[in-house]
Regions:
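Bacterial Sec-dependent N-terminal signal peptides
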Residues: 1-32, 498-501
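Beta-barrel outer-membrane channel/assembly domains of diderm bacteria
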Residues: 25-136, 143, 150-152, 158-170, ...
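Outer-membrane beta-barrel translocator domains and adjoining extracellular loop/strand segments
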Residues: 47-54, 98-104, 111, 141-148, ...
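A conserved mid-domain beta-alpha-beta active-site/ligand-binding segment of alpha/beta enzyme cores
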Residues: 189, 216-276
Length: 501
């Protein structure tokens, strides 16, 4: 490990040690926690499972018929000095049918064990730190295609690393009007990928403006940067502390970086810009959100408009209603800042600068793909972000090389509520037109294949299923050209209880 990465590791360990030292001198109070165990059976009219039966479920479900088991425990509490702590461990495994040319499991395996959660967290006032593997919460009651974040949807497993983040902090010069929050973290991508042991940096800053009583605007920028690792073509990539600083500011690479990284930015950078408006009243909330992807400066500068995920969500605060949540999403990613990424210099430009033969115009953003980090924005064969972007089939080495379909037009609608005020349910249906990629070589997408996927899920209440038992049923169906026409069912049995103090 290079000195720069040693520095990062020491910094993370030191930060955790400071928190732990504070914990050990005080007695915990307000402790809570529990354990859970689940078994799930997954059936289908074909070998493959319908899209929504395995999508946005933490990356642990197989994509062919089979069974899944998982279990774990977690806990949290607060010490007398105000420091909070949390911990969790979760394991999962499945046995599923072998894949075929038409359907296959993303990781290429029919039997697999996984670590879903393994973390320790500590917090103080508005700050929180988590170290390990921890799933993030999703927004919009499970009805959205993205869960409220098109770059991090919950479709893949979580990454190992550390995350330092804050709750909303009021600006001292504009209290009750302006507040902000941030994310900062570093992770490792340890799956079988093109650039082995790729490092991952994340930083995000969001702000919130209280326009009037009940009307709030939220905006922000979230950046993810893949860097370091070992390329099969270029060898070990720069990953010193100086290189880490370059990655943080999206600076160009120094000596030892590839020619492309020296001209552009070191590593593979992508992210999203968030524009959101919430109107909240005593009984309900209405949200409109525009989630914009970017791969370079053209996207950050809104050159890729109208690309993005547009979400309209209406939610009653009373969740015991027959209908408590309604959602409608329109997804458009066809433009990608234009049809050309660069152009040759004109004769006049060559006279002024003979060494500059190519000019970047910023098009062909090619979302979730990269020329050097060829696995792109995938993890264990699954798309990390918007799951309607279809990942490439694994090559002969078992490596996923990005996504093959990132130019789409899609609609998604969802409803959630409680039947008879007792049985929670969700219904969603998704329709997409798929255009592949710019300058694609796969003729399959020339015909613009269409796809419809639907889901109906419900959970029996404890008073019906038993005090410590959960019974959940899911019905799913696919119709179209992207996935085989199938209907599927999942039955989930769960047990759990709280720890006794």
């Amino acid at each position: 490990m290079k000195p720069g990465m040693n520095f990062l590791l020491r910094a993370a360990v030191t930060t955790v040690a400071v928190f732990v030292t504070g914990l050990s001198v005080c007695q915990a109070k307000d402790r809570e926690g529990g354990w859970y165990a689940e078994m799930t059976g997954l059936g289908s009219t074909g070998r493959g499972l319908p899209f929504w039966s395995h999508t946005n479920k933490g990356g642990i479900y197989p994509e062919t018929v089979g069974g899944l088991v998982r279990g774990g425990a977690d806990g949290s509490g607060t010490f007398s000095n105000g420091i909070r702590f949390s911990w969790g461990v979760g394991l999962a495994g499945y046995a599923a049918a072998r894949g075929s040319a038409q359907v296959h499991n993303s990781d290429g395996k029919s039997v697999r064990g996984m670590v879903q959660n393994l973390y320790f967290g500590a917090g103080w006032k508005k700050l929180a730190l988590e170290v390990g593997i921890k799933e993030r919460e999703q927004d919009f009651q499970g009805l959205s295609v993205t869960g409220g974040n098109m770059t991090l949807t919950g479709n893949s497993m979580s990454f190992p690393g550390y995350r330092l983040h804050s709750d909303w902090i009021e600006a001292p010069f504009a209290r009750y009007i302006l507040s902000f929050r941030f994310d900062f973290g570093d992770y490792g991508l340890w799956d079988n990928r093109y650039v082995k042991h790729t490092l991952l940096h994340n930083q995000a800053l969001y702000f919130k403006v209280n326009i009037t009583r009940g009307l709030v605007f939220t905006g922000g920028l979230e950046l993810w940067s893949q860097w370091g690792g070992t390329s099969p073509v270029y060898g070990r990539q720069p990953q010193s502390f100086v290189d880490y600083l370059r990655v943080m500011v999206a600076g160009s690479g120094g000596e030892g970086a590839t020619k492309s990284d020296q001209i552009n930015a070191l590593g593979n950078h992508l992210g999203r810009e968030l524009l959101r408006l919430d109107w909240e009243q005593d009984r309900w909330r209405l949200t409109f959100q525009h989630d914009i992807p970017f791969e370079d400066g053209s996207g950050v500068g809104f050159q890729n408009f109208p690309d993005g995920v547009n979400t309209l969500h209406f939610s009653f605060k009373d969740k015991d209603r027959w209908v408590s949540d309604l959602l409608l999403e329109f997804i458009y990613t066809k433009w990608q800042s234009g049809t050309r990424h660069d152009r040759p210099a004109t004769e006049e430009e060559l006279k002024k600068n003979p060494d500059k033969e190519i000019y970047i115009v910023g098009g062909c953003d090619n979302y979730f793909n990269n020329g050097e980090y060829k696995s792109g924005w995938t993890y264990n064969g699954r798309t990390i972000g918007l799951p309607l972007f279809v990942p490439a089939a694994k090559d002969v080495d078992g490596i996923t090389r990005g996504v093959v379909n990132n130019r789409i037009v899609a609609w998604n609608a969802g409803v959630a509520g409680k039947m008879f005020k007792k049985v929670p349910y969700t219904v969603k249906i998704t329709y997409s037109k798929n255009f592949g990629k710019y300058h694609q070589t796969d003729s399959f997408y020339d015909s613009v294949p269409k796809q419809v996927s639907g889901a109906f899920e419900l959970t029996l209440p404890k008073r019906i299923a038993g005090n410590t038992t959960l019974v959940s049923l899911g019905l799913y169906a696919d119709k179209g050209s992207i996935y085989p026409d199938t209907a599927g069912v999942t039955i989930r049995l769960g047990w759990g209880n709280c720890f006794r103090n």
